[in-house]
Design a protein with these regions (language model features):
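Positively charged, solvent-exposed patches that mediate nucleic-acid binding
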Residues: 1-115
Length: 115
């Protein structure tokens, strides 16, 4: 994922979480905040309780790939996604549908725009 699409700084994470705009399901919690950019930015948090490094990295890869294919549907938002324990056993396609569920629930999905 390109640098301009990532949220890395702890201060940015704290600011978005402090706004308390969130939605959740059994696998993910999503915190979000409007930004002034033409695109979304994504921050991912996977707790050490979810497994060893290679398991956490796999979860993060699944999340990044899911958002890469949906970046035209979610614009002008900073999104923090926190993985819960239920995501550990899910295959890739179910991770995507679970993220879709939370995004639709939070009304962050927009009509597809080419770009």
């Amino acid at each position: 994922m390109k640098k301009e699409y990532r949220i890395k700084r702890s201060q940015d994470f704290d600011n978005i979480i402090r706004k308390k705009q969130s939605f959740a399901n059994r696998q993910f919690v999503i915190y979000y905040q409007k930004n002034k950019l033409e695109h979304m930015r994504l921050g991912i948090s996977v707790s050490k309780k979810l497994g060893k490094a290679h398991e956490r990295n796999k979860i993060k890869r699944y999340i990044r790939e899911t958002f890469k294919t949906r970046k035209n549907y979610v614009k002008n938002y900073d999104i923090i996604i926190i993985a819960r324990a239920g995501v550990k056993e899910l295959p890739f396609l179910e991770v995507g549908s679970s993220i879709d569920h939370v995004l639709k629930k939070s009304k962050l999905y927009r009509k597809r725009e080419e770009g």
